[in-house]
Amino acid sequence: MWRVPVLLLVLGGAGLRVPAAGASTVRPDDIIPGVEDSVVTPGTEDSVVTPGAEDNVVTDGATEEPYESGLTPLVTKNTESVTDLHLEDGPTQESTVHAKEESQSTTTLNVVTSHSREKVGEDTETTVEKDGLATVTLVGIIVGVLLAIGFIGGIIIVVARKMSGRYSP
């Protein structure tokens, strides 16, 4: 009676070990100074400075001088002010900071942000929406996988009972 669940556990676990073996994590301790790693900075090609397609921020190319920890900084050094701003693009850090810094000037930018202002009575409430889509998607994937495993396990149990002759509908 207990053989079928153990068999399902072993077979199901073997199917999950193969994809998990391919996953790897890189810690800062694992990176050897002077050795090229697989980290790619978007917006740079052949050490030429190009504006980033997503955030309109200029990123520097790879430098020859190693830093103390052997890692290159992830903070960009140069930023450009954007005059051709597409409103259908998502909000970026540079565009919201730019709007806050130049709030003293007479011209203001109409920037799409994830902040919504709701006027209730005479009070103005500002709500900040976090990216909850990733969490909902992850929970949906986990629930879907668990349901699929249960469904397939039920089919295997029904087939095993039918083959043993103990199945009576």
Swiss-Prot record:
The keyword Cell cycle does not apply. Residues 160-169 are cytoplasmic. Residues 140-144 are annotated as: Requires for dimerization and lipid rafts association. Extensively O-glycosylated. Contains sialic acid residues. O-glycosylation is necessary for platelet aggregation activity. Disialylated at Thr-59; sialic acid is critical for platelet-aggregating activity and for CLEC1B interaction. Residues 23-138 are extracellular. It comes from the Eukaryota. Glycans are attached at residues 25, 38, 41, 44, 47, 50, 59, 63, 72, 76, 79, 83, 92, 96, 106-108, 113, 126-127. It is a single-pass type I membrane protein. One of its GO terms (cellular component) is filopodium. Residues 161-162 are annotated as: Requires for interaction with MSN and EZR. One of its GO terms (biological process) is regulation of substrate adhesion-dependent cell spreading. Residues 1-22 form the signal peptide. The chain crosses the membrane at residues 139-159. It is found in: Membrane; Cell projection, Filopodium membrane; Cell projection, Lamellipodium membrane; Cell projection, Microvillus membrane. InterPro entries: Podoplanin_domain. Keywords: Cell junction, Cell membrane, Cell projection, Cell shape, Developmental protein, Glycoprotein, Membrane, Sialic acid, Signal, Transmembrane, Transmembrane helix. Its main location: membrane. Residues 37-69 are annotated as: Disordered. The cytoplasmic domain controls FRC elongation but is dispensable for contraction. The cytoplasmic domain is essential for recruitment to invadopodia and ECM degradation. Belongs to the podoplanin family. Mediates effects on cell migration and adhesion through its different partners. During development plays a role in blood and lymphatic vessels separation by binding CLEC1B, triggering CLEC1B activation in platelets and leading to platelet activation and/or aggregation. Interaction with CD9, on the contrary, attenuates platelet aggregation and pulmonary metastasis induced by PDPN. Mediates effects on cell migration and adhesion through its different partners. Homodimer. Interacts with CLEC1B; the interaction is independent of CLEC1B glycosylation and activates CLEC1B; the interaction is dependent of sialic acid on O-glycans. Interacts with CD9; this interaction is homophilic and attenuates platelet aggregation and pulmonary metastasis induced by PDPN. Interacts with LGALS8; the interaction is glycosylation-dependent; may participate in connection of the lymphatic endothelium to the surrounding extracellular matrix. Interacts with HSPA9. This is Podoplanin. It comes from Canis lupus familiaris (Dog). The lineage of its organism: Eukaryota, Metazoa, Chordata, Craniata, Vertebrata.
